[in-house]
Amino acid sequence: DHFNTGVDTDTELTEIPEPGIYGGIQYKTGAGGQLALDLVYSNRQAGNEIEIRNMDFSRYALLMVNEGKIAVETTVTFRNCKFDAVTTGREDARISYVFEDCTLRNFQGSNATFTRCRLGGSSGDALNPYRNVTLRDCYIADLAHPDSGDTVHSDGVQIFGYPSLTAENISFDNCRFEVPAIPGGGSYVNACLMIAPEKSGAK
């Protein structure tokens, strides 16, 4: 629950106010003004076991780029970090992401493991996994937010897949979902876990 997941509020986080080099890792401006993390060109010196700790990325959405060009098995571990949205590639790649004790508004992608993480905090889905995503001891909540549109359709997790991909190896172990209804109007929250690969023609 909220007492034992997410970032440690007693630990000071280093805020990422703009693209630049922080903790020896370079972040560039990506598509749509997102913060881009590139391990092929900009951070070749970082090696294949990378740890990023006590960082606050919440000012930007974080986008992982050039994953398909990574030549050796690489692991990026985020410990006690705070995020807005995080997007990784959909396909299998020689990279995996580990999130421990992190807080995220949304994750969309593949090849990631979450432990003691808290996800949610907007009127959108908290998690959109494609392949190879594991959650352990995580908390998904805080989705009942008003929206400026006509309706709000928020799922704790929505697995909608992607054409040419098979949604698989997605698992949850000891996770708590709190997905309350949004009162009034046409706003509603749909499900703790929605599985709808037919939406994109996936399997």
Q: Each PLM stretch: what is its role?
A:
Residues 1-51:
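Extracellular "leader-to-stem" segments immediately downstream of a signal peptide or signal-anchor
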Residues 3-10, 144-147, 166, 181:
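Post-signal peptide N-terminal regions of Sec-secreted extracellular proteins
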Residues 9-10, 32-42, 59-69, 80-94, ...:
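Extracellular beta-strand/beta-solenoid scaffold signature
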Residues 21-22, 50-52, 73-78, 94-99, ...:
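All-beta strand scaffolds that present successive hydrophobic residues in beta-strands
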Residues 111-114, 124, 132, 154, ...:
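Extracellular structured ligand-interaction cores
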Residues 163-165, 170, 178:
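Short helix-loop boundary/capping segments
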